[in-house]
Amino acid sequence: MEYEFRRNSLTGTYLASFSMDHEVLGQWFSEELGPELAKIQQVLDIIKEIQAGKRDSWRLIGGDLTLDLDEEQARIYANALGFEQEYELEESMSLYDAESEAYCGLEDLEEALLSWYEFVQKGR
């Protein structure tokens, strides 16, 4: 999983971009976490608790995206994916949701969060 962090020097906004199949992680980092060090630290602390066996799983529901953590992986997905479709699609049709959902290993997420934390801290 590759990623890149940028900061707009004019607006002060932070932007995370992740590799294909993990694009939604960039949106989650940029929009749901943003530069809030306390929120980033909270997720890092929860990951440590899960790794230590003190907790089985955890969920953080954001404005547009939700983070689910368990002992093995992290799942980030658009809140809209949790809703049932009101209509059925034809057999040959399907909804494209690859940019609305991503999975990664818990350690991979932890590494990316630590990098994001450092990046945000240096930008202050």
UniProtKB/Swiss-Prot annotation:
Protein name: UPF0231 protein Shewana3_0655
Domain of life: Bacteria
Family to which this protein belongs: Belongs to the UPF0231 family.
Xref: InterPro entries: UPF0231 (IPR008249)
Pfam family for this entry, one: UPF0231
